[in-house]
C-alpha cells in the first residue's frame, strides 16, 4: 500500500504540472548568432537514488524554464531496486523522452559513473547505451575504482561528453582536491568539463576549468523535487547556460565540446569573458534624457537576469551620483548627471563593473556601454 501511495503522489504531482503549464520565465539575449539555452545536466530519478518518476523531471524542467536536461542515474547505486526491479539502465531516458518531445525539452541520454574519491563521480552525456557501463562495475564493491578509466573510455567510444561532478564531495575537509588520478585522466583527455557549482560554488574548481580549458557547468544534482533546493538557495537558480547554434541536441553537444557555456549559481555568472561579455552587453541599455538643461541617465535591463552594477566611470565632462545598484530583470534605474563641459553633440559611454559576473575567480567583468 505504501508503494502505491508514493507513486500515486508522484503521478498527481505530474498531473498538476501538466494542468497548470505555468513557468517561471528566464530569458537571455541571442549573442553573436548563438541562442543562450538553459540546461541542467545532472539529475536523478527513482531508477537510482532519486525520489521522482522520470516524467516529473521533464515537467519540472518546463516549469523552471529549462531548455535542456540530462537524467544521469547511477549504474552503481540503486537503493530502490527491491521496489523498482529494473535491469535496463536506459529505461529512465526512454520513459521521459516522449514527454520531453511534447514539452519541447531537449533530453540528453546520460549516466553518472560513480566511484569513491579519488577519483569521484563523472557524468557521461550523449551516450548511446547506458547498459554498456555495468560491465565495469565491481559487483562485490560497487564503488571500487578499478574500472573507472575503462568506463570513461567506453563513454568516449560512444561519442559522449564527460565532466567531473562536484569535486569537493567525499574529499578531506570537503574541499576540492587534485589527486594523481585526476592528472592521469586529464592527460588522457578523459575529462572535458567540471561542475564549478553543485550545491555550492568553488573558486578553485573554476580556476581548474580555466587552466585546463574545460567546459564550465553549474548543475542541481536534484534528487527530490526542485522545491527543497530552491528553498536552500533562497529561490535562486542553478543552471548551465549553453551558447548553441540552434535548439537541437546536436548543437548543444557541439557547444559543450567548444566550451561555450556559462555557470549560473545563486544569481551569479561564472564564465570566460568571450561568453559572458556579449550576454551582458546585449542585456543592458543606457540612454540620456535631457529636459530644460537637466540630464538624467537611465540604465535598463532588457532581459530577466539581475545584475549587481557599479559605475566605474562616465565620459569626461560628466559627473554621476548613484554609482552602485541592483538592476533586476525588466527594470530601469535613473540617476541625475551633471554636465561640466558643454558640448554640442555629447558622445557618452559608461564603464561598468558587473559585481555578480566573474571571468576569473577574483575578477569581475568590466564593460563599456554606449549611452544613446
Predicted features along the sequence, with ranges:
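Charged catalytic cores and adjacent phosphate/nucleic-acid-binding surfaces used
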Residues: 2, 20-40, 58, 120-128, ...
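Sec-dependent N-terminal signal peptides
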Residues: 4-13
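Residues that line or immediately flank small-molecule/substrate-binding pockets and catalytic motifs
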Residues: 8, 73-74, 198, 246
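Sec/Tat signal peptide C-region and signal peptidase I cleavage site
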Residues: 15-19
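A metal-dependent hydrolase metal-coordination microenvironment
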Residues: 23-161, 165, 200-208, 330
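Short, small-residue-enriched loops and turns at beta-alpha junctions
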Residues: 47, 170-173
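Short glycine-enriched loops at secondary-structure junctions
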Residues: 111-115, 168-171, 222-223
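His/acidic metal-ligating clusters that form di-metal
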Residues: 160-163, 167, 177-182
Amino acid at each position: 500500500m505504501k508503494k502505491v501511495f508514493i507513486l500515486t503522489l508522484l503521478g498527481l504531482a505530474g498531473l498538476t504540472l501538466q494542468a497548470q503549464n505555468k513557468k517561471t520565465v528566464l530569458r537571455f539575449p541571442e549573442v553573436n548568432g548563438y541562442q543562450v539555452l538553459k540546461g541542467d545536466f545532472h539529475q536523478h530519478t527513482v531508477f537510482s537514488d532519486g525520489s521522482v518518476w522520470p516524467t516529473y523531471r521533464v515537467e519540472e524542467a518546463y516549469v523552471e524554464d529549462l531548455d535542456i536536461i540530462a537524467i544521469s542515474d547511477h549504474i552503481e547505486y540503486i537503493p530502490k531496486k527491491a521496489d523498482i526491479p529494473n535491469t535496463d539502465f536506459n529505461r529512465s531516458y526512454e520513459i521521459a523522452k516522449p514527454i520531453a518531445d511534447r514539452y519541447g525539452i531537449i533530453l540528453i541520454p546520460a549516466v553518472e559513473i560513480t566511484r569513491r574519491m579519488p577519483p569521484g563521480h563523472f557524468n557521461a552525456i550523449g551516450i548511446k547505451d547506458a547498459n554498456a557501463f555495468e560491465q565495469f562495475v565491481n559487483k562485490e564493491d560497487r564503488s571500487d575504482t578499478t574500472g573507472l578509466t575503462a568506463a570513461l573510455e567506453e563513454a568516449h567510444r560512444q561519442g559522449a561528453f564527460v565532466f567531473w561532478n562536484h569535486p569537493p564531495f567525499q574529499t578531506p575537509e570537503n574541499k576540492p582536491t587534485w589527486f594523481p588520478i585526476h592528472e592521469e585522466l586529464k592527460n588522457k583527455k578523459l575529462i572535458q568539463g567540471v561542475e564549478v557549482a553543485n550545491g555550492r560554488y568553488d573558486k578553485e574548481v573554476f580556476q581548474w576549468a580555466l587552466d585546463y580549458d574545460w567546459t564550465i557547468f553549474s548543475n542541481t544534482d536534484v534528487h527530490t523535487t526542485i522545491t527543497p533546493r530552491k528553498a536552500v538557495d533562497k529561490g535562486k537558480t542553478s543552471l548551465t547556460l549553453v551558447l548553441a547554434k540552434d535548439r537541437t541536441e546536436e548543437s548543444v553537444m557541439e557547444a559543450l565540446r567548444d566550451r561555450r557555456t556559462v555557470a549560473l549559481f545563486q544569481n551569479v555568472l561564472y564564465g570566460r569573458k568571450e561568453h559572458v561579455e556579449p550576454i551582458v552587453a546585449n542585456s543592458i541599455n543606457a540612454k540620456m534624457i535631457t529636459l530644460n538643461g537637466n540630464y538624467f541617465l537611465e540604465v535598463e535591463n532588457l532581459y530577466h537576469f539581475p545584475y549587481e552594477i557599479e559605475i566605474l566611470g562616465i565620459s569626461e565632462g560628466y559627473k554621476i551620483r548613484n554609482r552602485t545598484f541592483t538592476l533586476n530583470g525588466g527594470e530601469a534605474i535613473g540617476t541625475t548627471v551633471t554636465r561640466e563641459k558643454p558640448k554640442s553633440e555629447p558622445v557618452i559611454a559608461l564603464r561598468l563593473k558587473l559585481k555578480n559576473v566573474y571571468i576569473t575567480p577574483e575578477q569581475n567583468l568590466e564593460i563599456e556601454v554606449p549611452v544613446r
